[in-house]
Amino acid sequence: MHRRFILLVAVFIAVLGLPTSAFAHAVLEANTPANDELLKTAPTAIDLRFSERIEPVGAIQLFDGDANQVAVGSQKLVSPNVSRTPITGTLAPGTYTVAWRALSSDGHAINGAFVFHVKKRGPNPEGIIG
């Protein structure tokens, strides 16, 4: 019993000593366009920068203010933690919502959404902080 307790304490101490990144999942650190940014011209791509390496699978969807999907190209990794997705559709003045999904290098799926505005601000969609 005493040996089992010592082993349990040793494992507990070893786990506490691991770097916190061993338990962390990637998080979105920055995006271009920025959340709630008012742009003078339409962007040509959406860049997402994560806190750690992500897998080369993921998805981005772009919606206009009427919830119509706007065409985007294939998402590509431009560095181990940055993805770029070209915008192939036309962006008229208004508010746009970006919904994204990514996969951390540890296999954890992450997702989120943000808005940006082209030439004029419109109302932000419900549930999207902006």
Put a short name on every predicted segment:
Residues M1, F23-A26:
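Absolute protein N-terminus
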Residues M1-V9:
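Bacterial N-terminal signal peptides that target proteins for export
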Residues A10-A14:
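Classic N-terminal secretory signal peptides
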Residues P19-S21:
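N-terminal signal peptide c-region/cleavage motif recognized by signal peptidases
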Residues H25-G130:
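N-terminal soluble domains immediately following signal/targeting peptides that reside
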